[in-house]
């Protein structure tokens, strides 16, 4: 939740890193990799989302939430791995005009994330997948999801 609610244009990568690690950085539920990165070829080459990063997130960035708790034990846990993009007001307006059907799906996903999952996304966060912020508590029960209490 902290990853999605902190994500915004102008946020420093280190701030996003700290938001996640302040909640999951303990010895048992530690994060095995960085908790987010750019997508495609940039996934393993460079990430603005790392400890101490001063790189600001910008409009046009396609990012992946990549929160994989690594217990270091025989116990496994569920994880969130999905992509979003950041778009400033002008880009969102242009996208909505050029691709109204896609825009309506993005808006429906954002509404679901807000109203059903209880996560407050910043307006510049565009969700392109139905998996965004969907966290099943058990691997074998993908139809269940964790939500924030009101």
Which residues make up each language-model segment?
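Active-site neighborhoods and metal-handling regions in enzymes and metal-associated proteins
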Residues: 1-150
